[in-house]
């Protein structure tokens, strides 16, 4: 049986990058970029948005965009609680929308 996607967190240095996946995706969407950044000594965190990466595809339909925005804010808070004063944010597709919102609302 195939395993379900999980958040990706790799702590390396005081430079942190938050990677946000696409709608109906998972941290696997940004795994290659995460590995590249890790090799360059960046700390990388790619959370799993609520309702994504489950055995029941309809779980995603039960969520609202504000839930995913809260997931994004929690991810930023997690990295700041880990001691990172500056967090770079990148997103793919839907994740890109939340990345831009994060940069606009939490510069």
Each PLM stretch: what is its role?
Residues 38-57:
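Conserved alpha/beta-hydrolase
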Residues 1-15:
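Short beta-strand-to-loop junctions in surface cap/lid or active-site-entrance loops
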Residues 24-35:
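The serine-hydrolase catalytic nucleophile loop
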Residues 83-92:
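Alpha/beta-hydrolase fold nucleophile elbow
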Residues 101-105:
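Active-site signature of alpha/beta-hydrolase-fold catalytic machinery across serine-
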Residues 55-83:
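Catalytic nucleophile-loop/oxyanion-hole region of alpha/beta-hydrolase
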Residues 18-24:
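The conserved beta1-alpha1 loop
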Residues 91-95, 99:
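Gly/Ala-rich beta-loop-alpha elbow adjacent to hydrolase catalytic centers
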């Amino acid at each position: 049986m195939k395993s379900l996607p999980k958040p990706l967190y790799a702590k390396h240095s005081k430079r942190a990058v938050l990677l946000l996946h696409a709608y109906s995706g998972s941290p696997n969407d940004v795994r290659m970029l995460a590995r590249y950044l890790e090799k360059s000594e960046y700390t990388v965190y790619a959370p799993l948005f609520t309702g994504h990466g489950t055995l029941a595809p309809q779980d995603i339909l039960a969520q609202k965009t504000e839930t995913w925005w809260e997931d994004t804010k929690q991810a930023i808070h997690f990295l700041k609680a880990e001691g990172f004063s500056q967090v770079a944010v990148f997103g793919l597709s839907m994740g890109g929308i939340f990345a831009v919102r994060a940069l606009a609302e939490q510069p």
